[in-house]
């Protein structure tokens, strides 16, 4: 009886085996030429970055509290934050002075990207703006200066289409958790270093690119600005 039952089962296995071998083999095509180039380039960059990270000499001695400097080490030769993601810390383009056309182009770029208009002013954000202009556009950071307060702060660089406008916070905003502690709305920092008790926001004003009055206090000669610094 066992023999009789095993024959149908054996036939089923043979039929399944034949069915599998009759199935068409799947053909895999090659990547398009542009994709091949991108893939190889990315692979080369990853291999290079990995190799540099493995052979790079690190100063200091690792301890449970972190890496500590030893005798002869310099502070700027290493950083525990070097693997963090962010924009480049060194200029990627040749350095250049701010010009009228460059200031207008830079202003409209910031406006289109929505990265500055309506944002609370703070010293830290102003420094980030300087770093971005320096590293991505190659603009030397002697352009970012403002008229004295209180009131609206106008850019001293003719062509830069952003001004700092004081705003009044309503009661809900002042008590909101998002505006507590070190939030720029509560810190009330001022570009001239004097606390006028005002909350400032960047405001885009395209008329700053066409209205030039040398007699107004907020527009100064760039040579005089450079001498003061």
From Swiss-Prot:
General function of this protein: Seems to play a role in optimizing the host cell environment for viral replication without causing cell death by apoptosis. Enhances virus infectivity and pathogenicity. Probably involved in viral immune evasion mechanisms.
Region (Mediates dimerization): 127-143
UniProt keyword Phosphoprotein present: no
Family: Belongs to the lentivirus primate group Nef protein family.
Swiss-Prot/TrEMBL keywords: Host cell membrane, Host membrane, Host-virus interaction, Lipoprotein, Membrane, Myristate, Viral immunoevasion, Virulence
InterPro entries: HIV-1_Nef_core_sf (IPR027481), HIV_Nef (IPR001558)
Topological relation to the membrane, as annotated: Lipid-anchor
Gene name for this UniProt entry: nef
GO MF entries: GTP binding
Entry's Gene Ontology cellular component terms: host cell plasma membrane; membrane
Name of this chain's protein: Protein Nef
Comment, domains: The N-terminal domain is composed of the N-myristoyl glycine and of a cluster of positively charged amino acids. It is required for inner plasma membrane targeting of Nef.
Lipid-modified residues, N-myristoyl glycine kind: 2
Acidic as annotated region, ranges: 76-84
Subcellular localization(s) per the UniProt record: Host cell membrane
Predominant place of localization: host cell
Domain of life assignment: Viruses
Miscellaneous comment text of the record: This is an African green monkey isolate.
Self-association and partners: Homodimer. Interacts with host CD247/TCRZ; this interaction induces down-regulation of cell surface TCR/CD3 complexes.
């Amino acid at each position: 009886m066992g023999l009789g039952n095993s024959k149908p089962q054996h036939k089923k296995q043979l039929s399944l085996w034949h069915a599998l071998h009759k199935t068409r083999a799947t053909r895999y095509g090659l990547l398009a030429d542009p994709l091949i180039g991108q893939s190889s380039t990315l692979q080369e960059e990853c291999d290079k970055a990995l190799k540099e990270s493995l052979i790079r000499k690190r100063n200091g001695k690792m301890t449970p509290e972190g890496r500590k400097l030893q005798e002869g080490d310099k502070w700027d030769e290493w950083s525990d934050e070097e693997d963090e993601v962010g924009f480049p810390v060194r200029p990627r383009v040749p350095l250049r002075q701010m010009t009228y056309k460059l200031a207008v182009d830079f202003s409209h770029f910031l406006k289109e990207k929505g990265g500055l208009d309506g944002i609370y002013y703070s010293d830290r954000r102003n420094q980030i703006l300087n770093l971005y202009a320096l590293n991505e556009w190659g603009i030397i950071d002697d352009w970012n200066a403002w008229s004295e307060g209180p009131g609206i702060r106008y850019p001293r660089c003719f062509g830069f289409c952003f001004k700092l406008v004081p705003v009044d916070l309503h009661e809900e905003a002042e008590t909101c958790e998002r505006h507590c502690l070190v939030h720029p709305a509560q810190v009330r920092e001022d570009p001239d270093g004097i606390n006028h008790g005002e909350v400032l926001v960047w405001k885009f004003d395209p008329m700053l690119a066409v209205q030039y009055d040398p007699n107004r206090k907020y527009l100064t000669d760039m040579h005089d600005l450079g001498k003061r610094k």
